[in-house]
Amino acid sequence: MARLGLAVCAASFHLFLLLASTSSLRRAPTEADTANHARRTAYHFQPAKNWQNDPNGPMYHNGMYHLFYQYNPHSALWDIGNLSWGHSVSGDLLNWAALDTALDPTSPFDANGCWSGSATILPGALPAILYTGIDASKEQVQNVAFAKNPSDPLLREWEKPAYNPVIALPADVPGDKFRDPSTAWLGRDGLWRIAVSAEVDGVASTLVYRSKDFVRWERNAAPLHASRAAGMVECPDLFPVAERGEDGLDTSANGAGGVRHVLKLSVMDTLQDYYMVGTYDDAADAFSPAEPERGDDCRSWRRLDYGHLYASKSFFDVRKNRRVLWAWANESDSQADDVARGWSGVQTFPRKMWLAKDGKQLLQWPIEEIETLRRKRAGLWRGTRLGVGAVQEIVGVASSQADVEVVFKIPSLEEAERVDDPNRLLDPQKLCGEKGAAVRGGVGPFGLLVMASGDLHEHTAVFFRVFRHHDKYKLLMCTDLTKSSTRAGVYKPAYGGFVDMDIDDHKTISLRTLIDHSVVESFGGGGRACITARVYPEHVATSSSHLYVFNNGSDAVKVAKLEAWDLATATVNVVVGDHHGLVAPALELEPTRTTQ
């Protein structure tokens, strides 16, 4: 951490006093509230208790990170009429303090719920929130709220003007299909723009609205995107990316050279997030995809994640000049389990996103702050040969709370499984189900067995397998949950996607996996393919988990490099300290300004 100047130290101490004394902080939960449970995460974002779903309005303001989220303050279950905006603050995107809810359903224009939306920093450093309200007639309308005191580092109070809604339900849109306003961007004509999801005359549409003052909005005649086949889409996110390099761009960035745009949509029918890279013309408010052959049906676009991820939301982190992604990872067991735990839903670990060199796909990687949680490291492996059927344990790390990075070297692709029917390659998830980790292959399956019991009766397999179709090789990445738990009533699919890279070129493939009790996030090929999974092994109630590297192919593979670390537990919304519920001194929430 950079050395802080005297002024910053004073500001940090002042902020600590604010946090320690404010009534907005939630008091220390009871033992039942905290759900000190083997499946509760240690460094993923989740409230101390109750239901959460979509991430809303992430932003960096006055030296603090803010994350809002869909939250039911009264229950661990989703409830249409009780959704509020939860609110937490952080100095490092790792440790979080929970504040009082920012928005509650208290007005006629949101009487039946404060649903998803976004935050925008207006001129004069005024934070504004646009969100969907379910009004007294149970119709979806778009509302605005402003920070009551923009100089408050915690932004504890928000005002909802009486003139809401700022966008009423359009006549050609059903009352229950008009929601999720995006972060606003400023066009070169000086007008603000937002994207809103709607179903217009039966067509899934991403509408564009313009405004001079952030209060009076006019709809653009043509939608930004429309798909007759996709069904209702949600949580639109339009953002710029640099054509070269990993730096992020402000949401309003535009220009003829050096900038592309990404349109991300969440599809209700599949509960998956899809995106397309392209160009955006702010004069016509038109988006042109870089891969038009994928068609208008966004279900044929690229997947943001091939696993259990939905309703993602990105923001530009001006502090570190990067674009950061959040997303909801719902539970995969039953509502009865949610009630018994007292909580439901986590956010994926924040990811940095940037454009790959091919200009067509995004790369995603855990933000660098996670490295500050690394503690004990397992022995470094280099050049270890994994023969046919090899299963080797990675010892020396707490396997239920770890960060694992491994690079596999494939000596030869000659034994890659041949696929004559190209239709078999159209559904990678189905292929992962048919060709699981236990099914002997040619080149692969090889990878990791995580959250495994000592006898391997329970394990989650994260692996690769190479196929050959004519003279081209296809690299499949899978997360197989079929053996993840012996419990009944748990959703245990095999997730999968193809890694868009030329495996024939270098014959190496990297895998990084974050393990956090019930969450397993994996990044293949340097972040070209990502898979998020929720797992619920039974053995954790009585014994420790194990971590293995394996190869079940008919050809040997090499572990060119393997490193694994224990990860420390972050302080995430569960307020700890003395009996008064004060913030723990270890919770770093100082403003991140620097002085010379």
UniProtKB/Swiss-Prot annotation:
SUPFAM superfamilies in the cross-refs: Arabinanase/levansucrase/invertase, Concanavalin A-like lectins/glucanases
EC number(s) stated in the UniProt entry for this protein: 3.2.1.26
GO molecular-function term, one example from the UniProt record: beta-fructofuranosidase activity
InterPro entries, A to Z: ConA-like_dom_sf (IPR013320), Fructan_Metab_Enzymes (IPR050551), Glyco_hydro_32 (IPR001362), Glyco_hydro_32_C (IPR013189), Glyco_hydro_32_N (IPR013148), Glyco_hydro_beta-prop_sf (IPR023296)
Sugar-bearing residue positions: 82, 330, 552
Key words of the record: Apoplast, Cell wall, Disulfide bond, Glycoprotein, Glycosidase, Hydrolase, Secreted, Signal
Main enzyme class: hydrolase
GO cellular component, one term: apoplast
Main location: secreted
Domain of life: Eukaryota
Record's keyword annotation contains Glycoprotein: yes
Gene Ontology process terms (BP): carbohydrate metabolic process
Subcellular location: Secreted, Extracellular space, Apoplast; Secreted, Cell wall
Reaction equations catalysed: Hydrolysis of terminal non-reducing beta-D-fructofuranoside residues in beta-D-fructofuranosides
Keyword Signal: yes
UniProt-annotated catalytic positions: 54
Binding, substrate: 51-54, 70, 78, 115-116, 179-180, 234
A Pfam family per the record: Glyco_hydro_32C
Family affiliation: Belongs to the glycosyl hydrolase 32 family.
Name of the protein: Beta-fructofuranosidase, insoluble isoenzyme 7
Native organism: Oryza sativa subsp. indica
Gene behind the chain: CIN7
